[in-house]
């Protein structure tokens, strides 16, 4: 029989949620942690994301504030436009809105590498083990035995004895599939998304996030996400194009790293020119284009069983409409670590974690759906009516998200 490695916590997935969990556990004095990542190598992949002030507060508390400030852009405003670039409504964000911490736009891969470096420095170089995907687990008399399969070495199985398993393994979570085999269906919004990164001259004040819509609910979201580019008077723009009613094939893997093609998205935005931003040029000069459908899942009635639980997208996949996915994973991570640090009974701690985090994240999944529906519904209204409607939509959304904060 193969001897199992002894540890306290096994985390499946070395994404933003999994790595933040490891750091938060370390801050609680829990240092015997193993993070299993299915990729053979962790590289700074992906495009830009937003991290909301409540999550930034937790990353600052973990000692990452200086590194984040040197990497991302502190967003100052959210600006809604029509497809000709005319401003309909603006909302201050982060510090400009009176929050004690900024909202940051940051390259997902750079944030992941920042977290990875901190984990290796604080918990040890061997904490994150790559090329291992969790396959199965079973509860034992005193803990949980986790089995992972190596991607190389003939697919050998490696086992771990732990007190808890945290499934932070994302959209296609193996831990979720084991816990909830009948609750893994992806629900499409009938919106296709294309994403990319393009270096351009700074627009507006260099800290603005724009959301532009036409009367068919075709949408562009764009914002700068790199402090390094800003230091040289340039902007690395993360852009997202969202087109409704595009035929979707969910038999093709729904994943954030699937390649897309310019010819499929450019026709929808061919005449979108704002004077200060040429959208066709923005798309055409992108260093990469990713394509995937906008999907979520219905909230689960419970996340975990016994000593196994879920976190982030594995627990509560949500539309990106509210820019809250990464933020909620970070808040999950801190809440989980707090409960495990405060409670010697692991099962009870996981139950308390779920009791704290499942209700607000369930509410945000629904709020993102409602916001998407509401914003598309006003697309054909006259511009003056849109202004009041947008103010009401964002105010309602903020009131729900604010209740998700970790105390």
From Swiss-Prot:
<keyword id="KW-0285">Flavoprotein</keyword>
<keyword id="KW-0560">Oxidoreductase</keyword>
<protein>
    <recommendedName>
        <fullName>Phenazine 1,6-dicarboxylic acid hydroxylase PhzS</fullName>
        <ecNumber>1.14.13.-</ecNumber>
        <ecNumber>1.14.13.218</ecNumber>
    </recommendedName>
</protein>
<dbReference type="InterPro" id="IPR050493">
    <property type="entry name" value="FAD-dep_Monooxygenase_BioMet"/>
</dbReference>
<feature type="binding site">
    <location>
        <position position="313"/>
    </location>
    <ligand>
        <name>FAD</name>
    </ligand>
</feature>
<dbReference type="GO" id="GO:0071949">
    <property type="term" value="F:FAD binding"/>
</dbReference>
<keyword id="KW-0520">NAD</keyword>
<feature type="site" description="Involved in substrate activation for the transfer of oxygen from the flavin hydroperoxide">
    <location>
        <position position="219"/>
    </location>
</feature>
<comment type="function">
    <text>Involved in the biosynthesis of phenazine natural products including myxin, an N(5),N(10)-dioxide phenazine antiobiotic, which has antimicrobial activity. Catalyzes the decarboxylative hydroxylations of phenazine 1,6-dicarboxylic acid (PDC) to produce 1,6-dihydroxyphenazine (DHP). Low activity with phenazine 1-carboxylic acid (PCA) to produce 1-hydroxyphenazine.</text>
</comment>
<dbReference type="GO" id="GO:0002047">
    <property type="term" value="P:phenazine biosynthetic process"/>
</dbReference>
<feature type="binding site">
    <location>
        <position position="17"/>
    </location>
    <ligand>
        <name>FAD</name>
    </ligand>
</feature>
<keyword id="KW-0503">Monooxygenase</keyword>
<keyword id="KW-0274">FAD</keyword>
<dbReference type="InterPro" id="IPR036188">
    <property type="entry name" value="FAD/NAD-bd_sf"/>
</dbReference>
<dbReference type="GO" id="GO:0004497">
    <property type="term" value="F:monooxygenase activity"/>
</dbReference>
<dbReference type="InterPro" id="IPR002938">
    <property type="entry name" value="FAD-bd"/>
</dbReference>
<dbReference type="Pfam" id="PF01494">
    <property type="entry name" value="FAD_binding_3"/>
</dbReference>
<feature type="binding site">
    <location>
        <position position="134"/>
    </location>
    <ligand>
        <name>FAD</name>
    </ligand>
</feature>
């Amino acid at each position: 029989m193969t001897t199992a490695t002894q540890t306290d916590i096994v985390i499946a997935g070395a994404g933003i949620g999994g790595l933040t969990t490891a750091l938060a556990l370390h801050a609680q004095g829990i240092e015997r942690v193993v993070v299993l990542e299915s990729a053979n190598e962790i590289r700074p992949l992906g495009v830009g994301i937003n991290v909301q002030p409540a999550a930034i507060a937790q990353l600052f508390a973990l000692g990452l504030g200086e590194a984040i400030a040197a990497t991302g852009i502190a967003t100052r405003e959210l600006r809604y436009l029509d497809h000709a670039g005319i401003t309909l409504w603006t909302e201050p964000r982060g510090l400009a809105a009176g929050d004690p911490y900024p909202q940051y736009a940051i390259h997902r891969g750079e944030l992941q590498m920042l977290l990875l470096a901190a984990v290796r420095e604080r918990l040890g170089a061997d904490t994150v083990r790559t090329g291992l995907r969790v396959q199965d687990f079973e509860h034992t008399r005193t803990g949980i035995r986790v089995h992972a399969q190596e991607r190389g070495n003939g697919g050998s199985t490696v086992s771990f004895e732990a007190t808890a398993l945290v499934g932070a393994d994302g959209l296609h979570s193996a831990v979720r599939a084991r816990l909830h085999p009948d609750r893994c269906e992806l629900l499409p919004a009938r919106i296709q998304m294309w994403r990319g990164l393009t270096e351009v001259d700074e627009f507006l004040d260099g800290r603005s996030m724009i959301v532009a819509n036409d009367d068919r609910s075709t949408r562009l979201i764009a914002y700068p996400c790199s402090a390094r580019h800003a230091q040289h008077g340039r902007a690395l723009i993360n852009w997202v194009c969202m087109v409704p009613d595009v035929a979707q094939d969910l038999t093709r893997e729904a994943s954030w790293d699937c390649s897309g093609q310019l010819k499929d998205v450019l026709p929808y935005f061919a005449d979108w020119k704002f004077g200060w931003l040429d959208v066709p040029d923005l798309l055409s000069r992108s260093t990469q284009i990713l394509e995937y459908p906008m999907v979520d899942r219905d909230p689960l009635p419970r996340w975990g069983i016994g000593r196994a639980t879920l976190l982030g997208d594995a627990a509560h996949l949500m539309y990106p409409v509210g820019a809250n996915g990464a933020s909620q994973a970070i808040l999950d991570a801190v809440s989980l670590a707090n409960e495990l640090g405060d409670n010697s009974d692991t099962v009870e701690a996981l139950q308390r974690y779920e009791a704290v985090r499942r209700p607000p994240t369930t509410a945000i999944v629904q709020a993102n759906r409602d916001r998407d529906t509401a914003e598309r519904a006003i697309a054909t209204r006259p511009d003056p009516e849109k202004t009041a409607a947008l103010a009401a939509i964002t105010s309602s959304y903020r009131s729900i998200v604010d209740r998700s904060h970790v105390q």
